[in-house]
Amino acid sequence: MINPNQQQVIALAAVVQAASLVEQLARTGDISGDASDPLLQAVFNQSPENFHDIYGNARVNLSVGLNHLNSIVGRTGRDINPDVTRYTLSLLLLERKLSKRVDMLKTLGNGIHSASRQAEHFSIGHENTIAALADLYKSTLSNLSFRIHVTGNPTYLQN
């Protein structure tokens, strides 16, 4: 059984992993399914029975986020990617703004449920599933007053 502090670290590692994948996708146009699938599965798991059900084996499934988080808060400060740190902080700020919008939270929940049907039909990382989530983002979160500015290769950013 993990305590609340460990749960918070794991949740933060998931945010850092998402930010890291955004940076990697913007720079290279590709991300690892091993790193992205656990995050997508967590999005679609809207009724977990316990905390472990959200991310499974966090040491394996969130290793990218845990390693980067360790770089950020570790004493050495080596290998800190400023873009990943900026995206992480931006995601946390966006979450704070979203938490005040009950209407948008409900819309997101319904949209995630709809996108989960795409994931069941195709696969969790299939382009149709990702497109459904991207459309959901465009119709909800992108309308908040705060926007995350992603930098990278213009070719990949257009997609």
Task: For each feature predicted by the language model, list its residue ranges.
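Leu/Val/Ala/Ile-rich N-terminal alpha-helices, chiefly Sec-type signal peptides and the beginnings
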Residues: 1-75
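Residue-level signal for the start and early helices of compact helical domains
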Residues: 3-6, 82, 139
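Long amphipathic alpha-helical segments with strong coiled-coil/leucine-zipper propensity
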Residues: 41-134
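Extended amphipathic alpha-helical scaffold segments
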Residues: 109-112, 137-148
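Aromatic/basic-lined ligand-recognition segments
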Residues: 150-153
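Alpha-helical oligomerization segments
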Residues: 156-159
